[in-house]
């Protein structure tokens, strides 16, 4: 993890690397869709588009445990194996990382953030690793 304490305004990828390290160290499953749209090859850009690459998709998806459970009944063909149990509730949140100072959210990023939030998937912009950590802590209290 890069030491960001001595850097006035780390790059976005440095902030994200530090945040991913914190997520891993604290047991939060996460993933990043490799969704970069830049490439010199016109052929590759066309292929990327056909494969679903979309400009503006948030940087990280994080699985966050919630504090509750829900009662689930699982019925099997063999009724002796049927059971109900408490299933922990988790949720998926998306985070768009930006630099502490000067990071700008693009029009396409704003559209994705709005679309995901309207679909009930909490999506936020965090300026720096510390803000992202505080966001995760705030929704897991």
Segments from the language model and where they lie:
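Catalytic phosphate/metal-binding cores of nucleic-acid and nucleotide-processing enzymes, i.e., regions
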Residues: 1-141
């Amino acid at each position: 993890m890069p030491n960001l304490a001595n850097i006035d305004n780390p790059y976005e990828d440095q902030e994200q690397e530090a945040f991913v390290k914190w997520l891993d160290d604290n047991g939060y499953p996460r993933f990043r869709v490799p969704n970069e749209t830049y490439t010199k090859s016109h052929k590759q850009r066309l292929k990327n588009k056909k494969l679903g690459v979309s400009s503006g998709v948030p940087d990280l998806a994080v699985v966050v445990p919630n504090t509750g459970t829900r009662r689930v009944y699982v019925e099997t063909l063999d009724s002796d194996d049927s059971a109900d149990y408490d299933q922990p509730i988790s949720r998926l949140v998306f985070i768009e990382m930006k630099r502490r100072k000067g990071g700008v959210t693009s029009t396409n990023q704003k559209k994705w953030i709005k679309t995901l939030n309207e679909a009930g998937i909490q999506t936020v912009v965090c300026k720096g690793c510390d803000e992202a950590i505080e966001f995760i802590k705030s929704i897991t209290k």
